Amino acid sequence: MCIRDRDGANVEISEQVGMDNIYIFGMRSDTVLDMYRERNYNPMTIFETNQELRLALTQMIDGTVLPDAPSALQDLYHSLLIGDWGNMADPFFVLKDFGSYSMAQRRIDADYADRDKWNRMAVINTAMAGVFCSDRTIREYNDTIWHLDPLKRKV
């Protein structure tokens, strides 16, 4: 099953399989652009108010995730909450999307428990995936961009 954010390719996938057969999470692109423009995003607020997220991030640096190298994820932790090298904290809004992602994951867990529903969704996703195969994509690129003649070879 697909759990996807709201970027362009994922929108195309959802159009193929139907919104009932995909899990979408996260902000819309216009909201992301507004947040960049307004520069009022503070991931520390999310960290302080979301217990699930706070636990996950804390476990990144307290030895829970990597007991043999507890400081290995320190830079990531710091970049998500404070920023690094003069850059804004969490520039890809990972923490902002965390709540939405968690809700999508809970929907996945519930749907997985319903075997008939899960199997139907799996068949639909598999059947509708053909449009995204690389052969079709390359043919389309060639037809619309490259305009190359196919190579012929004896087999």
Model-predicted regions and their roles:
Residues 1-5:
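Conserved small/polar residues in nucleotide/adenosyl-binding loops
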